[in-house]
Amino acid sequence: QRKHVTFDAFFADTMFHEVAHGLGIKNTLDGKGTVRDALKEQSSWLEEGKADILGLYMITRLHEKGELGGSLEDYYVTFLTGIFRSVRWGAAEAHGQANMVRFNYFADRGAFSRDAQGHYRVDMAKMRKAMDELSADILKLQGDGNYAGVKALLAELGVLKPQLSADLARLGARNIPVDVRFEQGKAVLGLQ
């Protein structure tokens, strides 16, 4: 599925992640305050997780309506690949925690498989189902202001398991960069 990792899908994932930050529940449904206050130190990672999964949810719905071109497989495969990229920066901060929860949530639901050579393959139907379920789970946790539920979700799924850790180490051993570094400035442009 390597051919399904595309710039356009990565750009859409990033753009709709940012759009999703502005959507969703800001105040708990019981009217007792903000989601941020209710979820305390757990709110940041869950908000990042919400933005990621609702971004993919929006992509899916727009694609179904014919408003977004390309292959849905491009978006899903690129989305999974983005988890590997992001987790390499660290699994302990908000984005990393959200990525680990999502990766393990997807794994538990068979949204992807891993072969003996360490190649991952997205199962489109199971990925779609897991995306829908995780979207609903996160929105419910936020709406209910369920601090204990959010903390339990992170404790259960927000862990870097040995197999993924080994796969990430393989990427590092091959000197595959975490991100692109652009050289900029007057000297690079020959203006000095």
Residue positions per predicted region:
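Long, well-structured alpha-helical subdomains associated
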Residues: 56-152, 156
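Active-site recognition of the HExxH zinc-binding catalytic motif
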Residues: 9-26, 51-52, 56
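Post-HEXXH active-site segment of zinc metalloproteases
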Residues: 25-49
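Active-site scaffold of zinc-dependent metalloenzymes
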Residues: 1-7
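Extended, compositionally biased alpha-helical segments that mediate assembly or anchoring
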Residues: 139-192
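Short helix/loop segment immediately N-terminal to the Walker
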Residues: 2, 30-31, 65
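An active-site-proximal "capping" alpha-helix that borders the catalytic cofactor pocket
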Residues: 44-61
